[in-house]
Amino acid sequence: MFSMGKIYKTSIENNSTEIIYAHKYGANTAREDSTGSLWFTQSTENQNEERLFGALDKAIPDGALFRLSFSEDGFASKPELVIDNLYFANGFYIDEGKNKLYLSEMMKNRVLVFDLDVSTGSLSNQTTLAIMPTPDNMELSSEGDLWVASPLSNQILSIDVESGAVTVVFDAQTDIGFESMKTGIERIENGEGFADLLSPELTGDMPGLLTGMILGDESQPFYVANLGVALIRVAKK
């Protein structure tokens, strides 16, 4: 977990928590790979919430992906910059089975895909997997599709990782939200922001702004995460 740049490691067995790394700017998403190394995104060069939302009012290419390597001596003292010049780097997913890394570039309305060499921590061959409104957190489903939250559309979208085809798997979009989404997409294409569009009229009956999901296997329900005070449980059809 993380809090304004601090990344924590929590042991449920030992009931203990330690700070793994304190980043200068805010950390968005952190994931561990099979080598024990820690990857994390920096959405923008923010040291407070006001600056964070400033990067949602204007497209700024100061997002990045970092990797904190791990060895038998523990974590490195400083992370390696893997990818920079991203427009609000958000959620990402490490797919070691396919040697791919997927990443949400929110202020470009796109999901990127890279070839991954997990042993060296290197990425190559950046391409755009899919175009979608404001991609946020993501998870790989039990069927092998990439589920991505879209706050601006108030939906969860599923991306076929082979073709890039996008379908809606959870939809809480309102009529006003649909119009706000169209406005936001146009603004982002012009290098502008959409923070002022994140209103109660957009979120509708959701407890808060839709930002992610928790997935189980094919027989289990999934949960929709948001910035409110409740998870939404959804039974799979």
Describe the predicted segments one by one.
Residues 5-8, 63-66, 110-112, 155-157, ...:
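A short loop-to-beta-strand structural motif that recurs across blades of beta-propeller domains
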Residues 11-15, 69-74, 115-119, 160-164, ...:
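Short loop/turn segments that connect beta-strands within beta-propeller blades
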Residues 15-18, 75-80, 124-126, 165-166:
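Predominantly a core beta-strand signature of beta-propeller blades
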Residues 44, 78-81, 127-128, 132, ...:
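Surface-exposed loop and turn segments in beta-propeller and other repeat-based domains
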Residues 115-162, 169:
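A beta-strand-loop signature enriched in Asp, Gly, Thr, and Trp
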